[in-house]
Amino acid sequence: MGRVIRGQRKGAGSVFRAHVKHRKGAARLRAVDFAERHGYIKGIVKDIIHDPGRGAPLAKVVFRDPYRFKKRTELFIAAEGIHTGQFVYCGKKAQLNIGNVLPVGTMPEGTIVCCLEEKPGDRGKLARASGNYATVISHNPETKKTRVKLPSGSKKVISSANRAVVGVVAGGGRIDKPILKAGRAYHKYKAKRNCWPRVRGVAMNPVEHPFGGGNHQHIGKPSTIRRDAPAGRKVGLIAARRTGRLRGTKTVQEKEN
């Protein structure tokens, strides 16, 4: 019998867990309240910080609590173009400016947004990675729904009450710069999680991986595997509908969507 393979050991956690000790906190929008639903609330960008393990910078935005005599600091995903000292307005009656938070139903068609809510009040789930954005396509006032185009290119119909930050997530073009050397990859994944360096299965011994062994590096069996395979065998293309390169032009695929 072979050893417990890497994919099985990952499920147990331990050294494979994400390195969250140095992270700055959850980046999300304000909890929706009366001030945002019926008017707007003003905050100020105090600082723009780096969050280890995240490509996009974060903005520390300070708001006056509308219900208690104190200040609240929120961590927003920074939109490209915002700066320290800038005023940020959140609410239904806020203006359409970079960094402001508005319901998508109040935005004109074609608006570029980021940190978009999937459901009303979930504080931002979509288009959050560096350089990403979603586009408001159309509104349906009767059903109070809005159609948006996501970074993947897929279209999604969401509630018009969902909020979003106006603009593009900062840090765009990050992946255009090549890593070039192993040392940079080492530090990148040291901040994220233990998944580097990744040894190929065909380079292992037969006891360590189903694709290991042989006089030359080859899989030696179909790389597709059924869904209900045991954990030690479930490697490769799991329950693949199709394999191989995608044929056809992108425009045709977009029309199908």
Curated annotation (Swiss-Prot):
For this UniProt record, give its keywords in alphabetical order, as a comma-separated list: Cytoplasm, Hydroxylation, Isopeptide bond, Ribonucleoprotein, Ribosomal protein, RNA-binding, rRNA-binding, Ubl conjugation
**What's an example GO cellular component term for this entry?**
cytoplasm
Q: What does this protein do?
A: Component of the large ribosomal subunit. The ribosome is a large ribonucleoprotein complex responsible for the synthesis of proteins in the cell.
Listed SMART domains: Ribosomal_L2 (SM01383), Ribosomal_L2_C (SM01382)
- Known InterPro entries for this protein? NA-bd_OB-fold, Rib_uL2_dom2, Ribosomal_uL2, Ribosomal_uL2_arc_euk, Ribosomal_uL2_C, Ribosomal_uL2_CS, Ribosomal_uL2_dom3, Ribosomal_uL2_RNA-bd_dom
Protein name (record)? Large ribosomal subunit protein uL2
Which additional comment does the entry carry?
Answer: This protein can be partially incorporated into E.coli polysomes in vivo, indicating it can replace the endogenous protein.
What organism is this sequence from? Homo sapiens
Record GO biological process = cytoplasmic translation; translation
How would you summarize the oligomeric state and partners of this protein? Component of the large ribosomal subunit. Interacts with CRY1.
Coiled-coil positions are none
Of which family is this protein a member?
Answer: Belongs to the universal ribosomal protein uL2 family.
What PANTHER family does the record point to?
A: LARGE RIBOSOMAL SUBUNIT PROTEIN UL2 (PTHR13691:SF16), RIBOSOMAL PROTEIN L2 (PTHR13691)
